[in-house]
Structure formats: structure tokens, C-alpha cells
Amino acid sequence: PEGLCFEAIMKEFVPINNDLDSYFLNLSDGQPYFPGEGFYYGGAVAETHTNKMVKMIESMGIQTLSYFITDWEINEDSSDARCFKRMYGKGAKMIDVKNVNQITKTMNQLFLAK
């Protein structure tokens, strides 16, 4: 339940300032989902909430990277991939669990862009 977790820890984030760049790295299974007795967090509501939390993080000047990590081949046009991109925007990355070096590559690209 990414959006719920992000909201719960938001006060711990350190916004950028003149002396500090801030980054938020998220590893995800792709879908925000949490069922409970009398409670359900998933689908479009969770997707919208997660996107809202990502935008709040980014409004603090924090650059975000979120990785959809899976052991199956990711089809960029799948509903899961489209959902993930809607939640995380330009910070959304699809990663094959068998090639986690992709994480360091994209992180380095972000750091060097500064």
C-alpha cells in the first residue's frame, strides 16, 4: 500500500535546500493494495492516492525514482505498467529482478542530471 506508507512517513522526508539534494527511492511490486476487515485499499482509489503522495514528495523538491520489480517480462503497454506510470510519472522505471544493475544505472543518471 505505497500511498499509505508514503503518507505515514512524509514528515520524515528532508526537503531540498541550498546545501542538500534529496532523493526518494521506492521499490515496488507494481500495485498499491491492502485488504483488511472492513477496509480495502486498491484499484483506482489507491492509484490516485499514491500519485497524490508522490506529487507531495516532489513538491518538497525531492526527486523520486520508483522501480516496478518483477520476475516476469514487463510489457510497457500492460495495464499494470500503465497504472505504475500514472502513479509515479517520470520517476517510474520497470526493472527485471534478474538485472538489478538497472537500478544503479538509473540512479546514476538521476544524480548526474543535477
PLM regions: where:
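Acidic, glycine-rich A-domain
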Residues: P1-K114
